[in-house]
């Protein structure tokens, strides 16, 4: 969020209340809108939302081929093109487009959760050693490089096979892949559509966190915070005091370069397709055009790199825990609960006006949220409960494990991705001192090892919305259900 959008808060007067958690701006709100825009949020969040969100989501509603509504989730805030938290589905058969601004530059930025059989009593005495060892094993910060050394030719296999490349090369357990969205591999990936510059930027970044809001966090299941015991058990969450590990990162410099490359291309070709947009940040091309397909195939390569990146990080986490606790990762039952993307476009079947359609669903700071009726797309153990959703909160307040519901059909099976910012990074740095924040967090039982103190200040808890209010809104809208709240005890910050 920048200062311009922060200053002007609150909804436009045309915003209509559909329910306590659904709000709508009609297609008549702005010239060019093809469908209404809907925001999933309670009144508290709506009143505090920056004006940029309402402007951007109504711009999205003007893109060719959009279906039903343009959506924004309760964690929504101003972004590039789409707001963060934006969801839109396009019908390729009706000229539906693909837009890098609806996916984000960090393609397949996503979340991963690893369970263990360790308890807080075992981990707390070693938390500093554990976090410091993880900091050494998983490089973080701008331009950091990973330990996996591969040739450009082998990197093509990473781009094609994603986390499945990791399985073939000793960085994954056989059970990991089934617990990743799309089994960790988007099949449409075509390395020939990725520029040399993008390849160069990704080549040495496997197994790295990067910077910004990316992190690796050790978390505790606290008594009273298990809301659905059956769903929790299916995910390997057995009771209070259990330790889990959360990872948040994406495709690093490679994804950014893919987005940059194709934004330029789309700005050049839009006149050829007669596309006019309300904001150049929404540059797009018809999905079925050669340029649209090229970007989709390149995006899939970056998404696969991100799946592989989180998998290599998981391998390193298992190694560090084995070293610190003197036990194998298998003995500690360090199983992958789930891995889910929240910056991506996916071809999915959805019902529009009673008719099944294959749509291109853009999720930008939004998570897929399949309910039990989409069982064929889920691991067998989750077919009765719905897809796990990993919702990252701030590093001071904690995170949530949720499940998707069939009610999420309302939003093209999409939900939020985190708490969402309320404050720009620049403002956070003005208001918070990183060293003081680090000390306060340690007093509150959270040991954090950060690359820079200014980067730590950017991610202070006060820079984010209250995750409880975000989750309340999701549940009230019927698109997500609480399973477990997780409390941070240690954090590696990029």
Place the predicted regions along the sequence by residue.
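Domain-length cofactor-binding catalytic modules of enzymes
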Residues: 2-56, 66-72, 80-84, 92-102, ...
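Short, conserved catalytic or adaptor-binding loops enriched in Gly and charged residues
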Residues: 62-63
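Acidic/polar active-site rim loop that often engages polyanionic ligands
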Residues: 109-117
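Patatin-like phospholipase
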Residues: 120
């Amino acid at each position: 969020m920048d200062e311009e959008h922060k200053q002007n808060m609150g909804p436009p007067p045309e915003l209509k209340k559909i329910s306590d958690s659904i709000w709508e701006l009609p297609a008549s709100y702005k010239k060019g809108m093809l469908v209404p825009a809907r925001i999933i949020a309670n009144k508290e969040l709506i009143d505090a939302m920056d004006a940029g969100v309402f402007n951007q989501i109504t711009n999205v509603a003007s893109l060719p081929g959009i279906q039903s509504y343009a959506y924004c989730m309760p964690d929504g805030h101003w972004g590039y093109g789409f707001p963060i938290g934006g969801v839109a589905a396009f019908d390729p058969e009706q000229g539906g487009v693909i837009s890098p601004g609806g996916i984000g530059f960090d393609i397949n930025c996503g979340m991963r959760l690893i369970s263990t059989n360790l308890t807080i009593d075992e981990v707390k005495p070693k938390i500093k050693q554990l976090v410091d060892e993880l900091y050494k094993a998983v490089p973080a910060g701008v331009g950091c490089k990973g330990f996996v050394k591969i040739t450009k030719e082998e990197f093509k296999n990473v781009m094609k096979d994603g986390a499945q490349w990791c399985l073939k090369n000793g960085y994954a357990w056989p059970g990991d892949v089934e617990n990743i969205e799309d089994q960790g591999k988007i099949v449409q990936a075509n390395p020939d559509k990725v520029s040399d510059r993008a390849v160069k930027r990704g080549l040495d970044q496997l197994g790295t966190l990067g910077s910004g809001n990316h992190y690796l966090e050790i978390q505790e299941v606290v008594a009273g915070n298990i809301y659905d015991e059956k769903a929790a058990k299916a995910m390997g969450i057995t009771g209070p005091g259990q330790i889990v590990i959360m990872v948040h990162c994406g495709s690093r410099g490679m994804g950014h370069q893919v987005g940059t490359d194709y934004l330029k291309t789309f700005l050049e070709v839009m006149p050829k397709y007669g596309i006019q947009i309300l904001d150049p940040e929404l540059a797009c091309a018809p999905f079925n055009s050669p340029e649209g397909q090229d970007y989709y195939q390149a995006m899939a390569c970056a998404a696969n790199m991100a799946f592989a990146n989180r998998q290599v990080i998981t391998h390193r986490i298992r190694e560090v825990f084995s070293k610190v606790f003197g036990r194998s990762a298998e003995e500690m039952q360090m199983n992958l609960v789930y891995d889910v993307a929240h910056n991506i476009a996916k071809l999915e079947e959805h019902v529009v006006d009673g008719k099944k359609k294959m749509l291109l669903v853009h999720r930008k700071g939004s998570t897929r949220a399949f309910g039990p009726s989409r069982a064929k797309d889920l691991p067998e153990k989750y077919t009765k409960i719905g897809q796990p959703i990993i919702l990252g909160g701030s590093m001071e307040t904690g995170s949530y494990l949720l499940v998707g519901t069939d009610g999420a059909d309302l939003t093209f099976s999409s939900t939020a991705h985190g708490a969402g910012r309320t404050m720009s990074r620049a403002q956070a740095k003005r208001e918070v001192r990183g060293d003081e924040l680090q000390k306060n967090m340690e007093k509150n039982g959270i040991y954090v090892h950060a690359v820079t103190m200014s980067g730590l200040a950017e991610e202070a808890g006060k820079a984010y919305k209250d995750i409880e209010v975000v989750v309340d809104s999701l549940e009230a809208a019927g698109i997500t259900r609480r399973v477990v709240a997780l409390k941070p005890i240690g954090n590696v910050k990029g």
